[in-house]
Amino acid sequence: MKQTIVGVLFLLVLTLSVSSAVAQDEAKRASTKQQLAQLLEKTGPGINVAFRVSQKQTYNFIGTLSKGLANAQSFEIVISVTAKDTIGFRIYPHYAGGYINVDKVKNGPGLMRLLLRLSDRGFLFWGVDETGDVFNGYTFTLESGFPEDAIRVVLRSIVNSDKFIGEMRPFIDGSSAAK
């Protein structure tokens, strides 16, 4: 009987400590979201992007960059505050009316090789999501606090990815690469 009581008390203490840790993690994530919202509100107008909270995922901010581009029609910017103490950028270029999808382009293997080379050359990395859509990305860890200045640098760098869309054109639709 005494062992049962000790076991129940142990499980109760363990449950309370786990739920307390989860609450602290959620509070930290909410605080990071608020800091990011304030930064995006200040920085967005300077890069011609109005950010808003996603209706589907409340820890995501979304915005569209469409000014100052020569190759992409726009860049759809998704910024996520994750439960794992990171902030992730996924920037989806729109070209010819939609996403660039490796399964639907003229030369998928060639585009994939180019994406790998561009990841080596550029500041932001290139990737493909689970549906095959091409994106540009960056991930911050929050171990040392909120990286306000670094986030500003990434936001200002997004427009520079437009030149890479020009390099992708032969693989996307067979047109000439932008000069």
Task: Identify the role of each PLM range.
Residues R169-K179:
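Short, highly charged C-terminal tails/helix-capping segments
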Residues G7-S17:
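Bacterial N-terminal signal peptides
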Residues Q57-N60, T86-I87, G132-V134:
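Hydrophobic residues embedded in beta-strands of well-ordered beta-sheets
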Residues Q24-A27, A96-K104, F140-V154:
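Second-shell loop/turn segments in exported
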Residues L116-G166:
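A short, solvent-exposed beta-edge/loop patch
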